[in-house]
Amino acid sequence: RLASDFPHQAAHRAKDGPYYSPFNKNYNRMCRVFDALFVGRYRRRGTRFLTKSELARKFLLEKRLSPEQVTTVGVGIDAELLRDRPDAGQTELEQKMRAQKTGLKLLYIGRIEPRRDPFFLLDVLAEVRKSDPDACLYIIGDGDAEYVDSVKAAIGEKGLESCVFWQKKAPQYQMKGVYQQADLFLLPTEYEIFGMVLLEAMFFRRVVLTTPNGGADMLLRSGENGLVLEKSDPARWAKTLLDTAADPEKKARMEQAAYETVIHENTWDAL
């Protein structure tokens, strides 16, 4: 009866699949309250939970729920929605990517916010350009105006105005061309319940470099179908990107492995 009395708590965990992260201070405080009120009764009644990632499952098991109560189901993608559309056309960003003839093309897609740390992206780009002066960063995303303005100011302060190209949004049916023009996809997130952009980038055969997070934990075998690094050193990220690009055969194997991971394990049909 408890799950029906408090469906929002049960559904919240089943749907969103959170896990512990120091970044989530407000959520961590909320969890302490929920745990005190509900977890003991969930244990006694054997309430079952579905999670999006193994990190989320571990988070619940640490609350002394039994393994039988918690099942990881992952997240799927509708591959048909990402297939070719002859009338898709090109975004302005894709046109700029096509115009770049030399240098790495790095891509970030997502909200511009502290959790995704766009300032770290700029630091990585600056490090990459020490070895590859023509490298550029392409961004699709928006956020709170004040924060976006601070990121734009940092671009100027770091002297990156000529190599960072930014579009606030683009329709899903035009994303294929953007992904496929990129050499590598970056997601330096502090915390990610799953991250659909990881699935999309892998579906379009891009090598992903990201942090340990909910989606990476489920999708990526670092060095095989993508790359996972702690977000501690922009120079290390830059070296990883440059080393990956310098080995086209290995990069191609990783791109194909990324695609096969999604097709065989992470479409809704596969799940």
Mark where each language-model region is:
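Membrane-proximal helix-turn-helix segments that form the acceptor-binding/catalytic region
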Residues: 25-49
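Aromatic "clamp/platform" in nucleotide-sugar-dependent glycosyltransferases that forms part
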Residues: 190
